[in-house]
C-alpha cells in the first residue's frame, strides 16, 4: 500500500499535467480579429446577393514555384466550394500574363467568363491534378478583397513561410 504523501504527490503531478495540457490546448485556439470577422460576415452577404449568370468568381493565388492559377467558384457559392484550377489561356490570356507582370495580381478577385473543360491537368511542383478552366474573359472585382485564407485572417501570411504551402479557402 502507498503512503498518503506518495498518493498526494501523484495527485498533484496529475493535476499539474492537466493544467499544462489544458493551457496548451487553449493556446492553440485562435480567435478571428473583430474587423476581419465583420468583413467575413459582409462577404457572406455579398456572395449570397451575387446574381446568377454565366460567370464564375476567381481569386488569383500566385505561388512562384507552381503553375496553377487560383481558386474559382460558382457565383453565389461560398469560397469553401472553390476549386484550385489550371487556366487554359488559348482564347484569353490571364490578366497578369496580358500585362507581362506575372503574379502581380496575387489575391485579386475577378469575375471570370469561361467554363470548366472537364479535363484534368497535372501540375508537377505540387504533384497535383487540377481541373482545367478555359478562360474567355474577365472583369476585375477587387484588388483588396476580403481574406479567405487562414493565414490572412491570423495575420501570419509571411510569403517566405508559406512559399510551399497550398492553402484552401475557408
Predicted regions and their residues:
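N-terminal hydrophobic targeting signals that begin at the initiator methionine
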Residues: 2-3, 30
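OB-fold and OB-like single-stranded nucleic-acid-recognition modules
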Residues: 31-170
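Bacterial N-terminal signal peptides that target proteins for export
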Residues: 3-17
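C-terminal motif of bacterial Sec signal peptides marking the signal peptidase cleavage site
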Residues: 25-28
Amino acid at each position: 500500500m502507498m503512503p498518503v504523501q506518495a498518493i498526494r504527490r501523484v495527485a498533484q503531478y496529475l493535476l499539474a499535467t492537466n493544467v499544462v495540457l489544458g493551457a496548451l490546448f487553449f493556446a492553440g485556439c485562435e480567435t478571428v480579429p473583430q474587423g476581419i470577422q465583420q468583413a467575413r460576415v459582409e462577404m457572406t452577404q455579398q456572395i449570397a446577393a451575387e446574381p446568377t449568370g454565366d460567370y464564375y468568381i476567381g481569386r488569383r493565388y500566385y505561388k512562384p514555384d507552381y503553375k496553377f492559377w487560383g481558386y474559382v467558384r460558382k457565383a453565389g457559392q461560398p469560397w469553401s466550394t472553390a476549386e484550385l484550377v489550371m487556366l487554359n489561356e488559348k482564347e484569353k490570356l490571364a490578366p497578369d500574363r496580358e500585362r507581362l507582370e506575372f503574379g502581380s495580381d496575387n489575391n485579386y478577385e475577378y469575375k471570370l467568363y469561361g467554363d470548366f473543360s472537364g479535363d484534368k491537368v497535372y501540375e508537377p511542383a505540387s504533384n497535383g491534378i487540377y481541373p482545367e478552366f478555359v478562360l474567355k474573359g474577365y472583369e476585375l472585382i477587387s484588388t483588396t478583397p476580403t481574406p479567405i485564407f487562414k493565414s490572412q485572417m491570423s495575420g501570419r501570411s509571411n510569403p517566405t513561410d508559406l512559399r510551399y504551402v497550398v492553402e484552401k479557402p475557408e
